[in-house]
Amino acid sequence: MQRGRRKPDWLKSRPPSGSRFTEIKERLRERDLHTVCEEANCPNMGECWSGRDGPGTATFMLMGDRCSRGCNFCDVETGGMKSLDSDEPENVADAVAEIGLDYVVLTSVDRDDLADGGSEHFAETIREIQRRDPEILVETLIPDFQGDPEAIDRIIDAGPDVIAHNVETVERLQWPVRDRRADYEQSLAVLDRVGRESDIHTKTSLMLGVGEYDHEVYRTLGDLSEVGVDVVTFGQYLQPSRSHLDVFEYVHPDVFETWRAVAEREFDFLYCASGPMVRSSYKAGELFVEALLREGRSPEDARRHARAAGGD
């Protein structure tokens, strides 16, 4: 393990700044909205919010800033959940419209304390955004809803453009990386149901550097391919604090490029965003989906567009 070791140069990033970044942050504070970008201390926050190649993207975190689960990689606090804010769906939709986003990502904390896992609240937020502007592309990064098919179907029925659910790591490392209530097969089942019950694009993400072996990553890609996942992302795990899971290793950028090639060429995923600083909602994946859906490009053209704009 690499406790105490300096981060390599390729993991250094500039603090977020710029007028666009400041504007978005102020709008979010005015409406008391949360973003996973801030809660998870995402290293790409400034780049995505500032919209270097467009109007910018923010990932809104629904249903509060405290989670019913305690994953050892995640910086979101556990316990002490509050009642849902019934105004949140409208507030998020208004903020999206005011900021001028073309592509918005919605995610949430886990709310195992709620009968439906918060799925109706999630779905209503999607619908409110679509009411404001049907042209806005909506990606949802959903929890597993404890495997409840009705909860998953509520998200499908709301009609987002992408449904993502993260397996996070290989099967062997689900614990200690994820909360014990998370399960590899259950996560695959969520993705499989979306693929079987709809034509909505599916997406998932894996962290590298938590102790996985290459053959386990390869097998995971195979499992994801079998359930019809369209887009996969790889990023470096970074320890949020010393009380979180240790970083096992800092994976070289060349390794990320290798996994990108394997995902796209061997397993035929539509797109793979892969790099040390890539996160699940990293804009390269969003640029790909936007090019594919909005502009009707072929997967090959959409890949080139996303890499050129995303700097991959």
From Swiss-Prot:
GO molecular-function terms, A-Z: 4 iron, 4 sulfur cluster binding; lipoate synthase activity; metal ion binding
Keyword Transferase: yes
Keyword hit for Iron-sulfur: yes
Domain spans labelled Radical SAM core: 52-270
Co-factor: note: Binds 2 [4Fe-4S] clusters per subunit. One cluster is coordinated with 3 cysteines and an exchangeable S-adenosyl-L-methionine.
Binding positions ([4Fe-4S] cluster 1): 37, 42, 48, 281
EC annotation from Swiss-Prot or TrEMBL: 2.8.1.8
Catalytic activity: [[Fe-S] cluster scaffold protein carrying a second [4Fe-4S](2+) cluster] + N(6)-octanoyl-L-lysyl-[protein] + 2 oxidized [2Fe-2S]-[ferredoxin] + 2 S-adenosyl-L-methionine + 4 H(+) = [[Fe-S] cluster scaffold protein] + N(6)-[(R)-dihydrolipoyl]-L-lysyl-[protein] + 4 Fe(3+) + 2 hydrogen sulfide + 2 5'-deoxyadenosine + 2 L-methionine + 2 reduced [2Fe-2S]-[ferredoxin]
Main location per the UniProt record: cytoplasm
Binding site for [4Fe-4S] cluster 2: 67, 71, 74
Cofactor requirement: [4Fe-4S] cluster
Name of this chain's protein: Lipoyl synthase
Organism: Halorubrum lacusprofundi (strain ATCC 49239 / DSM 5036 / JCM 8891 / ACAM 34)
Recorded name of the encoding gene: lipA
